Amino acid sequence: MEGPEIKFAEAVLDNGKYGTRTVRFEAGRLAQQAQGAVAAYLDEDTMLLSATSVGKHPKDNFDFFPLTIDVEERSYAAGKIPGSFFRREGRPSTEAILVCRLIDRPLRPSFITGLRNEVQVVITVLSIAPDEFYDSLAINAASASSMLSGIPFSGPIAGVRLALIGDQWVVFPKHSQLKEAVFDITVAGRVVTDAQGNEDVAIMMVEAEATEGAWDLIQAGATKPDEAVVAQGLEAAKPFIRQLVAAQASLAQQAAKPTVDYPVFLPYAQQSYDAVSALALEELGTVYRIADKIERQDADDALKTRTKEAVAAKVEAGELPQSALTEFSAAYKSVTKTVVRGRILRDGIRMDGRGLADIRPLDAEVQVIPRVHGSAIFQRGETQILGVTTLNMLKMEQQIDSLSPVTKKRFMTHYNFPPYSTGETGRVGSPKRREIGHGFLAERALVPVLPSREDFPYAIRQVSEALGSNGSTSMGSVCASTLSLLNAGVPLRAPVAGIAMGLVSDTVDGQVRYAALTDILGAEDALGDMDFKVAGTSEFVTAIQLDTKLDGIPTSVLDGALKQAKEARTAILGVLNQAIDAPDEMAPTAPRVISVNIPVDKIGELIGPKGKTINAIQDETGADISIEEDGAVYIGAVDGPSAEAARAQVNAIANPTNPEVGESFLGTVVKIATFGAFVSLLPGKDGLLHISEVRKLAGGKRVENVEDVLGVGQKILVEITKIDDRGKLSLAPVMEEAADQEGSAAASDGPEAPAEG
């Protein structure tokens, strides 16, 4: 039987001395009933299947495009069996959720405006090499399958990940290569043609961060990822994006279905827009000069109600069609957008009266909650973030079961966005995709400045509570987290601040004019063209996230926005520094963690049979002990003496000084035998007090049962009398101590007997 005809296209990306990476797209063999399906390969071992499906009928009463992106990680792709109880995949991993967001952001604005048929793109990870990322490949696969589906789609969209290793941007780097890199950037874009017929790559999405080892590499002389270097990275992505766009276009020419004429529901008719504009345009100009958010919203709601009533009256009078009522909200929003954007581009003034580069009033405060290990509040205008830091033993770090080679994470950042932060009601509970994404962005911004595990052996959980929201709570979370971590005593290598940039664009005199906005409001985010978040230290950028509603943004515009963001970040860092300029002393409620290194071959001895030895140390000292595979032992306790006592016992076992004949120890009787008593001198070091030596404690009298003289748990001062070839210790009592213990031992009332030979 003859199989299906397979169409393919590929792009070979040249990394110079780092070799080449081959991305291959295939169609026709898999998922043949989906409207569009593509198998995407990265070299030979990593394979994804992307399937794009579309519903047969438009969704009723939807005023948005119902697009769903799902990433299905299959454990078999990495040769694993899931670690869950049922041994099958369950809810998506955090990594899968983040990849969903990464794909959604450039794809969503590329579908035709007004589409209301449900579209679902499912990316299944079928195979992955142990050292590979699959996220950038997934962007290309999703775009390619959408290109083949027959849905009106302004692709292709290509995505690439680049790492700055030395002075070279390496495309599709491996996990192991990031150890040599100072910056890691993922860029999605498309090829556009201007009015003069010139082609360029327009940037649609950026996700970037300084790597975990960036600080040490920079100190060793590596390139510092400042704004200029980041701009170079955006330029470096363009040739690779062109190649991948060309490969997808080649596949589409071979295998794409004819474009289907799906019904499109435009948000409003021109007649509805004109009616709303005539009724509300002038007064909207006044409303959107009110600086206070609540006052502005109240005035806007009142105007919207009056305008809707006027439109309803016109409909009733037959001056407007019935559809004007259903189109009213979209038309009103569009008129509002015209008013706000026009004032920005024309006068350089924003709705709250600020200039384009002005920041709202800032406030920062630390140690705002009792008993927690670290806390802070950061406020920018009406955006208010509470940051709370919790420290614990490294054994509390997050264990990760995913396709990534990363299996644990000691720094965890969680972001919560309750409905009251915007003065509304809503669902509370498990985090949504947006909250997971915002938390991860703040985490990436801070990871490069965290102390190493060796310098600060703690698991760190950072929680950001959005108590008030009016623009960029994620960047507010970065600032609040910096304050809270310092308040908890975490020795950050440098403070980090973040700022959200916006963009407004329009055609003026035949040319597109752009205005970058610093510290955008929530309304400016909704009515603008871009959300560009930049976090960093005073010296370099640590994290970037870019989303746009446009088909793409020129890199020259992004370069200018980066420089504008640097000025704002510097100002915010000054405010943070005034609140706290160095790590505080650790809170008395925080655990004290100390470390000791032991030989790897001593790990088993320290643990003891079935954990007996280590559990005994923990029970006796009250400390928690965790042991790493490399022999690093971390000891934690709420008070210092407990930790030091545990360290002494660990050293006695794993780093002992060899006992010598003649040394005395205050030991504990741990076992009674017919021939004597075993006395514990140090953890893991026992010696035998022979029955002949026990007689000394009984005044030299014959001892039939050792239990008549000694009991388990009894303290006794002994001296080492002999160490045999196997290291076994023979003990004798020190009689001065024995005299003190006559009350508990069955000693005679007579004088001490002389020692027997």
From Swiss-Prot:
It is found in: Cytoplasm. Its EC number is 2.7.7.8. It catalyses: RNA(n+1) + phosphate = RNA(n) + a ribonucleoside 5'-diphosphate. The keyword Zinc does not apply. It comes from Clavibacter sepedonicus (Clavibacter michiganensis subsp. sepedonicus). This is Polyribonucleotide nucleotidyltransferase. Residues 591-650 form the KH domain. NCBIfam families: polynuc_phos, pppGpp_PNP, PRK11824.1.
